[in-house]
Amino acid sequence: AIVTDIDETLIDNSPYAVQQSLKGQDYEQPSWEQWTAKADGDTLAGAKTFLDYASSKGVKIFYLTNRKESERAGTLANIQKYHFPDATNEHLILKTAESSKEGRRQKISETYEIALLLGDNLADFSSVFDKKSIETRNSNVSQQAAEFGKRFIILPNTSYGDWESAAYHYQYNTTPAEKEAIIKRILKKAN
């Protein structure tokens, strides 16, 4: 089986980010749920072609996302709109009580061998990346290096993700100004 994330892996949500930016706002759950209910996200280049190819070879596809159960209808409609393979309720696995995807991956692995994981966030691959400091995440990437490009296929997401949360130590009440100062402090500059 292939286990894939949805947001910024298969579906492009940049119109939502633009909408929020034009309003001078960051991500917020109510507006996000309005966006996902529209089922209006476009596909990212190559996503459907790749999954269609895998499906044609008998590989089952599971869509593992941290979208909430209240977003199921819109999420399913969005992936069905583009005829992604195995786009069914059974293969759409939404967020449970915890945001870690590990338990949900383990549940899939009870029935299927997971050959490949696709995502835009390290936590899409293994719990060793869940809520860890930047230093620990970097160390774990080094330890898991052999998996990248073979079993773990990561698509860069420079807009958001746990890389950003790790920078401010998962303190989600950090103000936008504080976040900006932290990010500017840790950015790598070109020589």
Predicted regions and their residues:
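Alpha-helical substrate-recognition element adjacent to the catalytic core
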Residues: 1-99
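C-terminal cap/substrate-recognition subdomain and adjoining C-terminal extension
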Residues: 68, 72-191
